[in-house]
Amino acid sequence: MIYTECTDPDVRVEEDYVVVSDGVSLRTIDFTPPCDTPERPMVIFVAGWISLISGWKDVLKKVTPRYRTLYVETREKVSARFPERAHVDFSMPRMSLDISEILERKVVPEKRVCFAGSSLGSTVILDYLSMEVRQPEESILIAPICELTYPFWLPLLLRPVPPSLYTAIKPLLKWYLRNIRLDKHKEPEQVKKYGGALDAAEPRRLKANAFAIKDYSLWGKLPDVRSPVLIIGAESDTLHGLDVMNRMAALMPDADMEMMSSNRETHSEKMGDLIVEHMPGLKGMER
């Protein structure tokens, strides 16, 4: 993909693969604007489950010309490269370890960082933050998922289905998102976006990841998240429970919650402006 839609012409863009400790290669896209300096903070952006970077172009377009931004693609994405004949771990602890290792490889220790993420990416970030690891200045997290539970019928449906038949059940997954989890009347663009992400997903990884994170919970880890967190919810979002996010914020020592009007707005330029506004400032430095 050409990343011109995600940034300005004078921003340097470098696509790279980071080989993590279990041999998996994860794609990163590093946006570096001319204004970046060693003292200027940067953004580490981790998107949601099977999310495509094209779905975040409006957000990135606002952030990348102002701050170096490292966009990280998690291991369930089709871009990840796996060692031959290897059993790949898709669990949450492994995914948060990926963040730690990418940070170690791509960002010097002196560089101040802020995390941004969405949905499952936000969950991975919170799992990472709960450990004794390098901490960011702040994390801005859209609709984190606190516990990964599925409708009782979904594992029963998916477990016996080989990945080769993913095409056959994909319409059912789209129907579930469109009619149960999303507002197809108010946000048809989001329905289209999630449908496109399902179309682009790699079936074997999708299934393996879904079962590896099944029944995962953040509840016991949230009190250990000590660095500042801003949770972003959407008033019309039925995919991520607002009551749950409020409870999550209450359990963290330094967390706040802010609302946007819709899921679409959390993927808009307004979200990019919010990230810029929350970046830590330096004396005499423009945002």
Region annotations inferred by a language model:
Residues 117-125:
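Gly/Ala-rich beta-loop-alpha elbow adjacent to hydrolase catalytic centers
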Residues 150-151, 168-222:
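Conserved alpha/beta-hydrolase catalytic His-Asp/Glu region
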Residues 238-244:
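Conserved alpha/beta-hydrolase "acid-adjacent" motif
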